[in-house]
């Protein structure tokens, strides 16, 4: 799923109010980190992460590696923080994020 610029802007706005829940340290991305990211994405759809200063990777590198492993999209990377999005497949989730549709694509 490729996000449009309008959808990215919408998700960036939503990400402003959420707390950082993933913290990547010097150990990098391990199985526990991957499980935590997958669980959080399924429950919340939009998650914010942070890379500590002692980490061996940059926030861009972490986001670019986590996205394909979690089947998510990188929404934003600023400094040591990153935001990932993946639509939830849970049927019991009441407050799903509804992305704006691009008018040009919808007309096709």
Predicted feature residues:
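Positively charged, polar, low-complexity stretches
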Residues: 1-108
